[in-house]
From Swiss-Prot:
GO biological process: aggregation involved in sorocarp development; sorocarp morphogenesis
Stated name of the protein: ABC transporter G family member 19
Topology in membrane: Multi-pass membrane protein
Chain's gene name: abcG19
GO molecular function: ABC-type transporter activity; ATP binding; ATP hydrolysis activity; ATPase-coupled transmembrane transporter activity
Amino acid sequence: MKEFELNEYSFQEVENLNINTPNNNNNFGVVGDDFQLNSPDIQNSENQFKYIANELETDSKQYLSNLDAENNHNENDEDFKLRKYFENSQRVALGNGQKPKKMGVSVRNLTVVGVGADQSVISDLSTPIFKILNLFKPSTWKEKGSTFDILHDITLFNRDGGMLLVLGRPGSGCSTLLRLISNQRGSYVEVKGDITYGGIPAKEWKRYQGESIYTPEEDTHHPTLTVRQTLDFALKCKTIHNRLPDEKKRTYRKRIFDLLLGMFGIVHQADTIVGNEFIRGLSGGERKRLTITEAMVSSASITCYDCSTRGLDAASALDYAKSIRIMSDTLDKTTIASFYQASDSIYNLFDNVAVIEKGRLIYFGPGNKAKQYFIDLGFDCEPRKSTPDFLTGVTNPQERIIRQGFEGRVPETFADFEAAWRNSSMYRDMLEEQKEYERKIEIEQPAVDFIQEVKAEKSKTTSKRSIYTTSFLTQVKALIVRNFQIIWGDKLSLGSRYLSVFTQSFVYGSIFYNLETNINGLFTRGGTLFSVILFNALLCECEMPLTFGQRGILQKQHSYAMYRPSALHIAQIVTDIPLTIIQVFLFSIVVYFMFGLQYDAGKFFIFCFTLVGATLATTNLFRMFGNFSPSLYISQNVMNIFIISMITYTGYTIPKPKMHPWFSWFYWCNPFSYAFKALMANEFGDLSFDCQDTAIPSDPNKIIVYDNSYRICASPGASMGNLTVSGSKYIEESFHFRSDDLTQNVFILYLWWILYIVLNMFAMEYFDWTGGGYSHKVYKKGKAPKMNDVEEEKKQNQIVANATSKMKDTLKMRGGIFTWQNINYTVPVKGGKRLLLDNVEGWIKPGQMTALMGSSGAGKTTLLDVLAKRKTMGEVQGKCFLNGKPLEIDFERITGYVEQMDVHNPGLTVREALRFSAKLRQEPSVLLEEKFDYVEHVLEMMEMKHLGDALIGTLETGVGISVEERKRLTIGVELVAKPHILFLDEPTSGLDAQSSYNIVKFIRKLADAGMPLVCTIHQPSSVLFEHFDRILLLAKGGKTVYFGDIGEGSKTLTSYFERYGVRPCTESENPAEYILEATGAGVHGKSDVNWSETWKQSPELQEIERELAALEAQGPSSTEDHGKPREFATPIWYQTIEVYKRLNIIWWRDPFYTYGSFIQASMAGLIMGFTFWSLKGSSSDMSQRVFFIFETLILGILLIFVVLPQFIMQQEYFKRDFASKFYSWFPFAISIVAVEIPIVIISGTFFFFCSFWTAGLYTKFNEINFYFWFILILYLLFCVSFGQAVSAISFNLFLAHTLIPLLIVFLFLFCGVMVIPSSIPTFWRGWVYHLNPCRYFMEGIVTNVLKHTDVKCTSEDFTHFTNPEAVNGVTCKQYFPISEPLTGYVEAINEGDESKCGYCLYNNGEEYYNTLGWSFDNRWRNLAILICFWIFNILMVITFVYITRKPRR
């Protein structure tokens, strides 16, 4: 038997294959126009046959070989039919007794109830207050907002193997219908009605998750993975069990991988990273194809595609639809799709069409009958208008055309259309057809075969009731590989992390270098071990944003039934282990031996093993809070409270005996405490510490010699007459644990890690914070419109009509002639450079609209980036002129650029975003009222008047405006600026036909008013294409195919191609699709003509070059003197005010962030205050005061992590605004610093009042109390500004989290507490200690608190020793007189008994801080220095914002 080998292959362009309608024996499911398709090369047919056989669960390799032999006579036949190929493969499956999973869908009386717009308003800082007050108002307890029907009484069906096209304007409920059909029911108030899948009810269908999938409009992928890695992972998770006999999984995956990449034309991008809006990778169209390919890998029986052609050019979209058609026909795959701007070529591929308006079904039936249905209602279709555009346009009064004689008789509102449909004969026929289909289902019972096939696909170790194809172990393995690939794909962050750790290890090692083995090194050695735990804990902070960043991808892939969410966490654990081991080893190999810890291999590895456990536990603790929290800020603040508690109750700053009962339980629930005990036991267990020179009593001047028999070490664990202290005795008496418990403590530490793993798995399985892809809008209070209301619809239609009628009166543009010549753009790639634009030239004039077209990846967006001066990477060559002059500093300001990615600040409303653009970008001479009036006009024209007071929000949280509405807002933001030149990158992508028509008509008016503009457009209908005057057509590689006039009826354009042998363009054909087909655009398009070379030799190019030279020489026809060109429209002071006002609004509307800071400070204050409850005047209490202040230091450091995500997010929005010259870098930098000041002051005040009195720090000296509060506020301001400065220079949040610990080391290690100043190595003490702001904070606040503190030791605080001279009448003070440099005092333990003496280390607090070289007199100097450091941080923020002001693109 012949063995097949896998070779690479690709599909040819889809054409010339007759597609027949599936024989359903009814009048539904009729395909309109036939189309044809060329096959792949016959030499690769063996591989493709095997793929199909696998997809159909064929296990007959012999039969497949025979079938291949039968087809060998076609080897040189280029017309080998792909359809025939699929049909033959289907026969292979049937011949082996297997059947495809044939599952149709039947929907009856489906009603979906959503949250009304008035049910929730935009949250702000007043919202929680009013909610609390409402608890005391019984009248509000039963108040509920309104609901509305997103879908109302929908009844339709789609047979197995059928293709249903769902049409409707944005907001009509198309996406909701697709979600419900794919059985995604979360986030809706109520779902009524029935949906059955081949007779299986929706409730039972949950067991077959992954057999009906929803592919969302947005593209969500890991940006650092390549295409190959993304799809290979999906294939590993969806590899079926019933493959061909003896076929390896790897071979199976590779065959499908090659097939799908060939089908969608991304073979050459296989090793390109996916990228996103911030990371360069695939183009938008290529990323969309990857999304479709990933969905196909799932091999679902029912697939719902939501606007999946967004970003694809017309030819690629058609190729994609044809592939879907063939798979539906031959493999009985059921497809439901919702497309915006579908061409007739795509429309005709579908069996049935459903038209939805405002949640009402207004037509369902055969696609070839829909147009006539609406014509019979009284509507007329314009020539060359596509059928989908006509079907969605009839509901819009501004677009529809009423046939003569039907005036006043046609439906006007969505309710009228629904009533007309329900009264039609087609509706009754549809109901009968649905009943007949359901009877057929009852007879044939396709669910039986379906269930058997689903079970057969599952691996042997997968439960037959599981929704997953592969086993849990297989999922984990695939996820482990993917996790490593993700990490390796971001080498910068990985390298930065390890470099940071390695660098910090030397800092740690040098400051604690060669620790003393005498009694002076006892406490320092413990502090060293405590600090290494703290350092590794802070490194784990980066896990929090990573947890939130992967939620969208997890939700999508889980809906595809690729893997269990808990499997992802197990894979993360496996990934963590080697990375953590490397991190800990790099740190430990340096610090362990530089510290001078015990040179014992066993102890070194226990040290490493314990640190690994502590790091793993902390990492999973951070993830746990992320998985249990809906918001990053909530989890960040809660986690910071826990970190402070964990540090406090580690057992070092406050030993176990000093803990109060109300919080002491946390000591036992704290993994840090077990790690600390393990490290201490490991190091101290068999060490002894000498105190020969420091034993009590002693004479520093060496005059008095004491008998060693009566001397004792001044340390816990000491015994009379023994001048050494046992390490094990020391830790037992100081910290109340035994060194023998080392193994137990390590074991418990790892048990905490396991517990956090279990809790994470539980949270990931049962908590979904993404909203399931469903989003809802929130409005300002009282501004919510009525949803799906007839009167509201009429009102909105009238607004649009009025706006259209007064457009000419409003638009007054001032444009110029913009030319570009010989534009070349190259980017560095591995092994050299890549040319993306090749000698592109052209112009745009006032009054002209130029279309920029080409297949996906041809360089359209790249050209616009170059022309709009947005490129900051690569090399640009060529010349650009405006009115014959080189471009000046104001070019970006006077041009508008509608970018492909919709980047908006989520904390603003739609109206606020537009007004902000108008205020800062229109000329300052324009009155504010006029600017706002123009904003309202644009809102009306963009059909967004009802959205004016809606929060923009984010798609990830499910709160905010939709994808389509964001696109309209992107356009509106540029239009309100009244630019002189307008660049638009796919302005109609993702919009429905009517919205696209309105936008194109609007920019046509702009052009007619004198604005020159160029617009990339992927899928223009004939009607849209007619609005353009000229076209620049690009081929792959950025080569020019044509630049010139389109001509009336596109005759000038089409005649150019006809002149070189292309077939004539018919009257009914879309010219845009015609030229793309002619030039070989699309997934597998090709052309026999080298059009770029043809253009170079054409007379049209020579004429273009002559005119370009004339235009550059001519210059402007008239000039206006507007003074010196200005980079920004408004002065800096005005920009600063407006930016500050905007940030204030955003902060005001983010209670999670703002109140989170307040709560974090308050809770930290209460925890610390009650932990160090009512400190007295004992020696140990004085030490507790110092540690209380030290933990205040840590609070400020943790605040740094809170500001990171907010600053980095706002900086991304700033970069987008700066590129369009909204405002300069200085207003942003100074405003984002200023907006944090009141939050810091309030937070610090809360902390002060919650901790100062509870800890017993209050004194009768008001100046001291005030000073504590003042320097605390300054320190917190320093920390926040420090975090902002680091954020400003970081490329992403992960890098910022990596840099922060490196810098924090210098702050808390050199503050004078962890290591006293005299013990800091000379190298560091000479500069770092004096440049450390925390040193001045600690000196100022410690001297302030301890200045008036008198120390009175308790019996436990005294170092007890015997006075042998007591019998001779010598008192304790006489026996041991205190002389410098010793501090403290001596007294009898029991009054009247001078034989038992006690030594107290300090007399007062001043003696303590004098040993550190600190002075109370320096407190105001320290405060002034801290102010200087804060100002320095602000200058660094400003500097770094300036350096990074331009995005990398």
